[in-house]
Amino acid sequence: MNRSVILSDFDNTIVNIDAAAFALDHFADPSWKRIEALFKAGKITFEDSIREEYAMINAPENVILDALDRVVSLRPHFDELVEHCRKNNLPFTVVSAGLEFTIRHFLNQKGWLKFIEIYAPKAEYTSHGYRLRFPKFFDESSINFKHDLVKYHQKRGSRVIFIGDGLGDFPAAREADLRFAIKGSNLAVACLKGNIACSEVIDFQEVIDETRNYVG
């Protein structure tokens, strides 16, 4: 493999909180947590859990973004990671099950949309909450759309560096060539239990330092 790509989760990874969970906590029926519990128990798929949860959110985009602007901040040294990727021609994609318009909003504040791709379900606000349109799988055998994107890049000769924090990230992280998990996160615990090599990090300087040999 002669090229590397970075795929990173957004909520609780690039930013300091789970922005989607914040929206659910503040603007959705509390029963969304029952759906989340079903996913964690392995009774429904990652995509189905997100689809059902977001359908419970009763607030337009501008209301959600106004609330998030007061509480969201970037994890330390993410600015430097973006610059590191730009200078070294290292493709960077946010792969997230979060609300796509929130990701676009915070990246656009920094002018990063020209450098960073977003791979996430499109969310449309309706009278029945948010309706999602997930990316079409490249390989129907994939566990979820994040896992699918890792395999897509690998099949095209790229080495995949994955960064995340949640259980929904685990299939992608397990498949990736190099993986980082936010320290103490569900992903870090899952990798430890699965005996999968994973660097636990608290900020993005550690990612920059460990990926210097992967550029180009």
What are these regions (language model features)?
Residues 1, 17, 43-49, 65-70, ...:
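Short acidic/polar alpha-helix capping motifs at helix-coil junctions
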Residues 31-37, 62, 113-115:
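Short, surface-exposed acidic
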Residues 35, 49, 64, 204-207:
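Hydrophobic/aromatic residues in well-formed alpha-helices
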Residues 47-83, 88-90:
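Metal-dependent phosphoesterase signature
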Residues 77-91, 98-216:
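C-terminal cap/substrate-recognition subdomain and adjoining C-terminal extension
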